[in-house]
Design a protein with these regions (language model features):
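Structural core segment of the AMP-binding/adenylate-forming
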Residues: 62-63, 90-156, 477
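Conserved AMP-binding/adenylation subdomain of ANL enzymes
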Residues: 199-218, 226-266, 281
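Conserved AMP-binding/adenylate-forming
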Residues: 16, 42, 57-104, 222, ...
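AMP-binding/adenylate-forming catalytic core of the ANL superfamily
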Residues: 102, 108, 119-121, 268, ...
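Conserved pre-ATP/AMP-binding loop-to-beta segment of ANL
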Residues: 32-33, 161-180, 187, 212-218, ...
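ANL superfamily adenylate-forming
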Residues: 3, 41, 126-172, 187, ...
């Protein structure tokens, strides 16, 4: 293949990059005896972690996993989930983690859509393992205790103890991680993250979010490792920082603060809802959290009053960033120095910060033209942190990119100094407690109820979660009446709890456009006219 020579330059002679698992190799060499992972009463040194990862990689290779194969992982946070990430990287395979709160049918779809060859499934989810089985999935291994699967990950590691597995040679564009996101249709899409891109992401996070981080720091995990927290902990591994897990999937705030004090935790990645809960909990005053240097939050806007409360309790340690899975969190940053506890012109209320190092943001109109300061348009971004594209989804890729720019789907403006302000979303997606929720997914499940003929789900403001869903329903003609409690009980086993609408309303009809569509803005206007938005905000979460 002939590579055209750039005018006035030279075609790149090599696309080889570091395999991300080399960071583990480095830690085993330089910090081998230092603790790298803590969970409950167990801890592992970096040398032990490297050994477990090689053993798991050897087992996967023996079972036929090679470079480019996808390894699906559905698990709560635990040691073996963390090992699986580096084992996939080491082989040049692709780590495909899911949100452990998903339903079995949703995980089955992801198994098929990703083309997964192997499935590592936590023992608490036998129905997910059963649902995900398909002709392309060659084997299922169990994480932890349980009664399903060809064998357990623990058994595989024990069988291959002492194995030496080299880090596979990789190029910049070789995939390492399928980061599941969602489109406006509600179907999850696999954003392809690569070794070269993620090396930049790691470097950028260290430079912009937590400068000066070293092996003497410590990081507490308070979110699922399948998404943003997984990226955050990968960054920690680059500096030999130990990762500390909560003892169970239940978020125990007192235990979190106890761990912060006991291990002198210096950084946390979280979302505004969790941060608000931590700051308002009595434990914030019982434990010493003076070791915290960076409390990094993202995933949703944070109310100004909540910001001030967090600053007053924790000190000047808040760092905000704006970024999607497709850009691996690398769009803007609002560093601790710009989080002012006092209101005033200097406080820059409402901004999500300025462009990350090495990234460029453009506010564009529908025609792709760059808009002037304070003009509202779509937030678009270019730079090394942008993903390769969506796996096996040319239609989504065509919509997501324009003239090389990635289109976030978020609306906003930029001031004259380059600070970005998010003003809305181009889609109907809403964010509740840091989780993206796409109404169509929930609407489809509600419409399986025999008494419901039409439904519109939309996000509305909530003082606790940022936004919550409400479902406006119209009964099927001739159907028996259904109560709010009955519909909630019907929906509960069909959607994860975080996707459950906070309220269900029943109307005679939904507002429609001239084309027979149900515009969400008209539904929202009607909710407001009836005083229901205020009612929702006053309902206990």
């Amino acid at each position: 293949v002939t590579i055209p020579t750039p005018r006035g330059g030279l075609a790149r002679m090599s696309r080889r990059v570091m395999n991300l698992a080399h960071m583990l190799t480095q830690n085993a060499r330089r910090h081998g005896g230092r603790t790298g992972f803590l969970w409950g009463d167990k801890s592992w040194t970096w040398r032990e972690i490297d050994g477990h990862v090689s053993a798991l990689a050897a087992g996967l290779a023996e079972r036929g996993i090679v470079k480019g194969d996808r390894v699906l992982v559905h698990s709560k946070n635990c040691d073996e989930m963390f090992w699986s990430m580096f084992a996939a990287f080491r082989l040049g395979a692709v780590w495909v983690p899911t949100n452990f709160r998903l339903m079995p049918d949703e995980v089955a779809y992801l198994a098929t859509a990703s083309g997964a060859k192997a499935f590592l499934c936590h023992g608490d989810f036998p129905e997910h393992a059963k649902a995900a089985a398909n002709p392309g999935l060659e084997f299922i291994w169990r994480i932890g205790d349980g009664g399903f699967g060809e064998k357990s990950v623990g058994e595989v590691i024990a069988e291959h103890a002492g194995a030496k597995v080299d880090n596979a040679a990789v190029d910049y564009d070789d995939p390492c991680w399928f980061f599941f996101t969602s489109g406006t249709t509600g179907r999850s899409k696999a954003a392809v993250l690569t070794h070269g891109q993620m090396a930049f992401v790691v470097t950028n996070h260290l430079a912009d979010l937590m400068p000066g981080t070293t092996e003497t720091d410590a990081s507490l995990v308070v979110a699922p490792l399948s998404h943003g927290a997984g990226v955050h902990q990968l960054v920690q591994a680059a500096r030999g920082v130990p990762t500390i897990l909560l003892p169970s999937e239940k978020f125990d705030i007192a235990e979190a603060f106890r761990l912060i004090e006991a291990h002198r935790v210096s950084n946390i990645f979280t979302v505004p809802t969790i941060l608000k809960m931590m700051v308002e909990h009595p434990a914030v005053d019982r434990f010493d959290h003076s070791s915290l240097r960076f409390v990094i939050y993202a995933g949703a806007p944070m109310y100004r009053e909540d910001q001030k409360a967090a600053l007053n309790k924790l000190g000047p340690v808040l760092v905000q960033y704006f970024g999607l899975g497709e850009v691996t969190g690398n769009i803007t940053v609002m560093p601790a120095s710009l989080h002012d506890p006092e209101d005033g012109p200097q406080a820059r209320i409402g901004t999500c910060g300025f462009e990350r190092t090495g990234m460029q943001v453009s506010i564009q109109g529908d025609d792709g033209r760059e808009l002037k300061a304070f003009e509202t348009g779509e937030i678009c971004v270019i730079g090394p942190a942008v993903f390769a594209g969506y796996y096996d989804n040319p239609e989504a890729n065509a919509k997501a990119f324009r003239d090389g720019w990635f289109r976030t789907g978020d609306l906003g403006h930029m001031d004259e100094e380059g600070f970005v302000y998010i003003t809305g979303r181009a889609s109907d997606m809403y964010i509740s407690g840091g989780s993206n929720i796409y109404p169509r997914e929930v609407e489809e499940k509600i419409l399986t109820h025999p008494a419901i003929g039409e439904v519109a789900v939309l996000g509305v403001p909530d003082p606790f979660w940022g936004e919550v869903g409400v479902a406006v329903c119209v009964a099927r003609e001739g159907a028996a009446a259904v109560s709010e409690a009955e519909l909630a009980a019907f929906l509960a086993p069909k959607v994860p709890r975080y996707k459950m609408p906070k309220r269900f309303f029943f109307w005679e009809a939904l507002p429609k456009s001239g084309y027979g569509k149900i515009p969400k803005r008209l539904v929202r206007d009607e909710l407001e006219a009836r005083g229901l938005l205020e009612l929702v905000s006053k309902t206990d979460s």
